[in-house]
Structures are given as structure tokens and as C-alpha cells.
Amino acid sequence: MNGENLNLGTLVSETRNPATMTLDQLSTLEMMQVFNQEDRKVPEAIAQVLPAIAEAVDLATASLQAGGRLIYLGAGTSGRLGVLDASECPPTFGVPHGLVIGLIAGGPGALLKAVEGAEDDPALGEADLKALSLTATDMVIGLAASGRTPYVIGALRYARDVGCRTAAISCNPHSPIAQEAQVAISPVVGPEALTGSTRLKSGTAQKLVLNMISTGVMVKLGKVYQNLMVDVKATNVKLLDRACRIVVEATGADLDSARQALEQSDNDVKPAILMLLANIGVEAARERLKQHNGYLREALLGG
């Protein structure tokens, strides 16, 4: 893409912030106060786009219920944030690796070191999705603070051609990627404290939106009971302790009873909770959960 035609200076995320023009003259504390004041604008901006975020959650839920995947895709900071959110889903919600996927322009190496030119080719975005054998049941969410990254545009166009559900997260209004997606999520956080450094407010906004999407989807998929992560995989000492505390919180049982139930269920939290609340054995608990597609609340109510 010809850089002369971009005119990035017209983008909100690239303009200078009049409140931070003296950044290099401030004391350390004053500088931190300015950063904090700017960061306060992020949740306010997100509050304005909650309906779009909710729509994206519903679309992603439908894709996963149909056997599809949730795929995040971006370049630079945006790509890294998608990879981060995707990587947290298996341990937090017990979903298999590959159900939620993060792609970054330039491949895994770009997580640690910038890959020159990777974001400037729309064909690379399409190629990365083709490498995943994209199908119409998948959902693709493109991320770009500027809203005009060619890698993301190419990917969203290909996803649309395949018939996927799509969403775009950008921090500039009426952006090109927003026009390529079914749902446009555009929290306008204003100019950055450091001009053009979109790893700041724009990155924070994208991270918060991704948190909301993935957590919202997992709640709707039955991975949460009350506000407890009942599909957590106890793969280390910390998570085993958390699993035990979750069982205690959900059932009111004492610690020893919770541990015993977890031992019988091979550290699987949902059947352990059901065993204690319904006073049934582990196999009966597993069968009841299976009948209710893993939804613990329905299994408790349905009997």
C-alpha cells in the first residue's frame, strides 16, 4: 500500500492530544497523573459501544454452538492482544486449544519482534485464514487501532466471502475495517497521551473489549455458574486450590468435602459441585451434565 495516500494524520488515534503537549516538562508524578487522567476515558468510550459488543458476543456464541471457532486477527499490539486473550481461554474455561485462536501479522515471531511489512499486505490476512481451513461456521474478529490495517481488511473480506460471522474492533469512527464487518465496535478513546502510540488507550480499549467478548461468550456457553469459572482446568497447584475454593463457594460444603468430591471427579469442578448439591455419585453427575449439554445450572434444576 502506498504510504503517501494513507493520510493517517486525520485519524483520531494519530492526532496530538492538547492535554499532554508538555509531557516532557512534567515531574514524574505529574506525568503519571496525566496518563491516569487519559486512561479514565477508556471505560467511558467502551460504555458507548456496549450494544455492538453484545451483538458480537451473541454472534460468537452462535458460531461456537454450531461447531465453529472464534478467531482474532490483527497486527502489532492489536494482534498480540488477540493472541493473549485466545491463549487464556483454555485454562480459564476448559475449552480445547484451537477453539479460540489469535493470529498476528507476520506469524508467532511477531509477538516478540516487529516483522517489517507484514501488516501492509491484505493477501497475508487471507492466507493466514486459509491456513486454518476457515469455514462458514467460524467467526472472525479483526483488530486494528487505526481501523485501516491492510492485513486485517484482507482477512475480513475473505471471511465474509466464506460466509463467516465477522466483527471489527477499531478506535477510529467509520473505519475501513468497520465497513468490512457485520458488527463494528469502535470505542473512540481520543488522541493518545503520546501522539500515535496506540499501545496506550487504544490498546487498553481493545483488551477490555476482548475480555468482555470472550468472557461473555463463555458465560453463554455454560462455562460459568453464578460468577464462578466452573470449567477451570486444575493443571497446577494454584488452579487446584482455586478449583477447591470454587466448589466450596458454590456448595457451602467444607474444604474436606470439596476436596473429596474433586478427587472422585478427577478434579472436574462441575460434577463435583453437582455431586454435593444433588447428593449423587460422580457417574450420575456426569450423566446429568451430559443430558444438559454441560450447563450446570440446568443440570441442577432439571434433575
UniProtKB/Swiss-Prot annotation:
Residues 60-223 form the SIS domain. It comes from the Bacteria. It is an enzyme of class 4 (lyase). GO terms for molecular function: carbohydrate derivative binding; carbon-oxygen lyase activity; ether hydrolase activity. Induction: Induced by MurNAc 6-phosphate that releases the repressor MurR from the DNA. Repressed by MurR in the absence of MurNAc 6-phosphate. GO terms for biological process: 1,6-anhydro-N-acetyl-beta-muramic acid catabolic process; amino sugar catabolic process; N-acetylmuramic acid catabolic process; peptidoglycan turnover. It catalyses: N-acetyl-D-muramate 6-phosphate + H2O = N-acetyl-D-glucosamine 6-phosphate + (R)-lactate. Pathway: Amino-sugar metabolism; 1,6-anhydro-N-acetylmuramate degradation; Amino-sugar metabolism; N-acetylmuramate degradation; Cell wall biogenesis; peptidoglycan recycling. Its EC number is 4.2.1.126. CDD domains: SIS_Etherase (cd05007). Keywords: Carbohydrate metabolism, Lyase. The keyword Lyase applies. InterPro entries: Etherase_MurQ, Glucokinase_regulatory_CS, MURQ/GCKR, SIS_dom, SIS_dom_sf. The active site is at 88 (proton donor), 119. PANTHER family: GLUCOKINASE REGULATORY PROTEIN, N-ACETYLMURAMIC ACID 6-PHOSPHATE ETHERASE. Homodimer. A lyase-type mechanism (elimination/hydration) is suggested for the cleavage of the lactyl ether bond of MurNAc 6-phosphate, with the formation of an alpha,beta-unsaturated aldehyde intermediate with (E)-stereochemistry, followed by the syn addition of water to give product. NCBIfam families: N-acetylmuramic acid 6-phosphate etherase, PRK05441.1, PRK12570.1. Specifically catalyzes the cleavage of the D-lactyl ether substituent of MurNAc 6-phosphate, producing GlcNAc 6-phosphate and D-lactate. Together with AnmK, is also required for the utilization of anhydro-N-acetylmuramic acid (anhMurNAc) either imported from the medium or derived from its own cell wall murein, and thus plays a role in cell wall recycling. Belongs to the GCKR-like family. MurNAc-6-P etherase subfamily. This is N-acetylmuramic acid 6-phosphate etherase.
